Design a protein with these regions (language model features):
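Positively charged n-region of N-terminal signal peptides that target proteins for export
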Residues: 1-7
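Beta-strand-enriched, solvent-exposed domains that form extended recognition/catalytic surfaces
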Residues: 257-357
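N-terminal pre-catalytic segment of deacetylase/amide-hydrolase enzymes
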Residues: 21-82, 251-264, 312, 334-357
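Short, compositionally biased P/S/T/A/G/V-rich stretches that sit at domain boundaries
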Residues: 236-272
Length: 357
């Protein structure tokens, strides 16, 4: 009887771990075209390669709302599930991406800027989808979500405003955008993709207070522990469009890593940030297998304090611009899959001015 109870307990524990460790991935695209800027584009041919890979390898492509509602309700996510998203609502999403998506019957989400759409409403040469086109897509089940009224950064404060005044102004702008989306498509998910992926702690608190789920641009998988004020997405356009690199990302697992108090800060002047300390909850990896890389700095030395905490002293000053630390480790229980966590920084010039986009 004792052995039977031990077996039942072990099976129950394994099942619990399996359900909780299920991971999903959100892919981020912009243009699907051969003639648009390479840094935000994937060719139609390569986009179809991506979708074929998803189908051939039994990934579950689901509406973004399935994943977010699962996290909100703490319902286990289908393992190897994927959501497809497009930022900026370019016309080639309709003319180039949609026929391919329809071929595979894959759902997707488009993040839109209502102010930009409205300015181009009578422009036949516009590169942006119209409300008529977006309504038709909405009627077919495409999720239409918020990318801000204009494509303005949430953290680049202008007009001499304080942080509080700026957030009040941005709240009005974002709610205006949400209302316009609802008026034209009937949808209001309160899903918001940060323009340029830029955010800070104050913006995260603002998103939570205003009941917005906010999506960023740092990489990583998601699970039930994901912070809904900075949901990661994997960029899948050039130069990250090769299947060889996408394969590991699609199979990645969410790394349950958090930041020490005061280290969630994302914005520093050049040469200001020197180190960072992480808390980690997972036991499903060997410490020796953990690797962390930082943009332009390469692989970093990891300093373990105990089994649940480690630090990185940056090998050089973080470069000006958008910077990422990517930490990965092979899973013990799921061979061939990697835990993946990304921490973003937005490094200003030494005088405190913003870098150029």
């Amino acid at each position: 009887m004792k052995n039977m109870l031990q077996i039942l307990f072990s099976v129950s524990l394994l099942l619990s771990v399996s359900l909780c460790s299920n991971a999903a991935v959100i892919l981020q695209y912009h243009h699907v075209s051969d003639s648009t800027p390479a840094s935000t584009s994937i060719s139609p041919k390569q986009f179809e390669v991506h979708l074929q890979y998803l189908k051939d390898n039994n990934f579950k492509v689901v509406p973004l709302s399935d994943l977010i509602e699962g996290i909100k309700n703490q319902q286990p996510l289908p393992d190897k599930s994927v959501a497809i998203t497009f930022d900026d609502a370019y016309t080639d999403v309709l003319t180039q991406a949609k026929p391919i998506l329809d071929k595979f019957a894959f759902p997707y989400t488009i993040y839109v800027n209502p102010g930009i759409i409205n300015r181009n409403i009578n422009n036949d040469a516009s590169h942006y989808l119209s409300w008529i086109q977006l309504k038709a897509l909405s009627d077919e089940g495409v999720i239409i979500a918020n990318h801000g009224y204009e494509h303005n950064s949430m953290v680049r404060i202008t007009d001499g405003l304080t942080q509080t005044q700026w957030l009040i102004k941005q709240t009005e702008s974002l709610l205006k955008a949400e209302a316009i989306i609802k008026e034209n498509t009937g949808q209001s998910w309160r899903y918001y993709a940060y323009p340029y992926g830029e955010y800070n702690v104050a913006v995260q608190e603002w998103a939570k207070k205003n009941d917005f789920v906010a999506f960023s641009q740092q990489s990583g998988a998601i699970d039930l522990s994901t912070d809904l004020t900075s949901v990661p997405r994997f960029p899948a356009s050039k130069p990250y469009d090769k299947i060889s690199g996408l394969r590991d990302k699609l199979n990645s697992l969410a790394f349950n890593i958090s930041l020490k108090d005061g280290q969630a800060k994302t914005i520093f002047k050049h040469k200001e940030a020197k180190n960072i300390t992480f808390n980690i909850e997972s036991d499903d990896f060997y410490k020796s297998a953990l690797n962390c890389y930082i943009s332009d700095l390469g692989k970093q030395k990891i300093i373990w304090h105990d089994d649940k905490s480690f630090s990185i002293n940056f090998s050089k000053d973080l470069p000006v611009g958008r910077v990422r630390a990517n930490c990965t480790a092979a899973s013990i229980s799921k061979p061939g899959r990697y835990y993946w966590y990304s921490k973003p920084w937005f490094i200003l010039n030494s005088d405190g001015s913003w870098y150029h986009l």
